Amino acid sequence: MPHANDIFWPELHPSLMPPHFNNYPQLLLAEGDSWFAWAYLGFDVSPSILNALKFNRPTATLCYAYTGHTSGDMAAMSVSAGFMQEFAARRFQAVLLSGGGNDLFNALEQGSILKPAGGADPNDPASYIDTVELDALKNYVTLNYQQILSWRLLPTSMNKTTPVLLHTYDYPMPRPAPARVFGKPAVGPWLLPALQAVAAPTALHLDIIKEIASDMLDCIRAFHDPAAGIHVVNTCGTLTPAAPNATGDDADWVNEIHPNAAGYAKLAAKFRPQLAAIGVT
């Protein structure tokens, strides 16, 4: 019978941490963003990749992920000291990372990456992309991942050979669908206003985001190095896009940039064979 992924939160819920994990043949460590933890209110009742995972053996995940985490947050000692210390505290079967998505979404929301077409072809998605800013963002995310991955190799680490799994998100449809808490808009949308601000044609919105995301995610794909124990799970193209005018849960997406339970189940299905290949079943 499949076992649910038992998720523990050392920072959010330290009082719920067990005295030991001897009852779990498989112990995972996770850090990331809302694709691993919809944690605005400090709990994990909402779907995520982590709680969509099922295993053949009892499995626990120590999760340091928070909604809104950027790769910069994850790399900052002020935020990730607990996560970093886990490498020296106990041996894990795998480390799961979810980062880079919020770096991109925040940059778009703040007016970076996109630009008016100007004199360029207004029907070409590339005309609306500031490649200099996009390259700078890729470099920033790359440096942050290098910092995070370096903790695994510190002299005090018990996990120098522990496999690490990263992922590549998917292509969100720009649409008027904010994230909601208790049914009320809480934050977002992120993409649609940014595209409207540069007068990008509606018909090109998804193509522009796909082009930006594909380029941006190359910096994560570049870390794929199975010989070094680093594996990138290619999740792009897994989810069915929402309709461009949908204001709420639609297809595989609960809002503009977050999958729903069905979407996360599809993403978890992409993780399972990769986990099995490294002995986590």
Write out the residue ranges for each language-model feature.
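Serine-esterase "nucleophile elbow" of acetyl-processing enzymes
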Residues: 2-67
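Short amphipathic alpha-helices and their capping/turn segments at secondary-structure boundaries
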Residues: 14-20, 75-95, 147-161, 222
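Oxyanion-hole/transition-state-stabilizing segment in secreted/luminal serine hydrolases
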Residues: 80-136, 170-179
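Histidine-centered active-site loop/cap adjacent to the catalytic His
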Residues: 249-281
